[in-house]
Swiss-Prot record:
Transmembrane segments: none annotated. Its main location: secreted. Expressed by the skin glands. Antibacterial activity against Gram-positive bacterium S.aureus and Gram-negative bacterium E.coli. Has activity against C.albicans. GO terms for biological process: defense response to fungus; defense response to Gram-negative bacterium; killing of cells of another organism. Disulfide bonds join 31-37. It is found in: Secreted. Keywords: Amphibian defense peptide, Antibiotic, Antimicrobial, Disulfide bond, Fungicide, Secreted. It comes from Lithobates berlandieri. This is Esculentin-2B. The keyword Disulfide bond applies.
Amino acid sequence: GLFSILRGAAKFASKGLGKDLTKLGVDLVACKISKQC
């Protein structure tokens, strides 16, 4: 579910890799939730 995706993204970001990718992912999720995309 969504929570496991967020947890996976947090784990990915905590490695210090793909921070830009993580930010894009978070932006995309926020966009879908607010239906602004």
